[in-house]
Every structure is written in structure tokens, then in C-alpha cells.
């Protein structure tokens, strides 16, 4: 889930910032109680970076950062999740998949900005789809 969805699922109050590692450990514990095994909390925004929280083992989390590019666009979360889901069914390691998905979304945003597409029209993933080939 993204942060908003994770808050809704766990009953934790949403806030824009001020999240600690302990907060995310608590959140991933609550998501595990709901049946999740491996967890990605996507799209934590800061001025310069997008961060994804990854937890494959109870009590452990990693923060994977990607340089922020372009405008906020519709559909990026769906693309991010689709790359991870595809890799998951193909046995690809989760941490590597999250890095791959974040890089792919970044490339989609850059390709879309180049075409001057309005942010509400999503992203031009077709231009960079070939980069997902294994």
C-alpha cells in the first residue's frame, strides 16, 4: 500500500511527515497481523526523494530512496505495483524488484514530461516498457 492506504488498513492516523523508524515497524507489524508476509509501503514524499519502505522479515525494515523527478502523476502507483507483482510471481527478490519498479516509474515520468503530457493523463509507460525485459 501507499502511506495513506497503510494508515487506513492499520488504523494508524495519517500525517504528512514526522514518521519514525519505530512508526514504520509498528505499521508493518500491524500489516502482518492482517496476513501480509512481505511488505512495501510506497511513495513517501520529501522535497528531493521518494522513499519506499520494505519489510521482508518481522522487526526489520529498509528505506529505499529514489531521486524525485517531474510532477506527481496519476497511475504511477499502479505501474509500481504491477512491476513488483510480476517480479513476485517470477521469483525475483523483493528489494531488487522495488528498486526496479521505482526506476521504471521514474523513467516513465521522464518520458512523459518529455512529451509534455498533462499530469492528470498519467504516464507514457509504453515508451520505456522494453526496459522491463529480463
Please identify what each model-predicted range represents:
Residues 61-75:
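Short pre-catalytic strand/loop immediately N-terminal to key active-site residues, enriched for Gly-Thr
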Residues 95-134:
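Charged C-terminal helix
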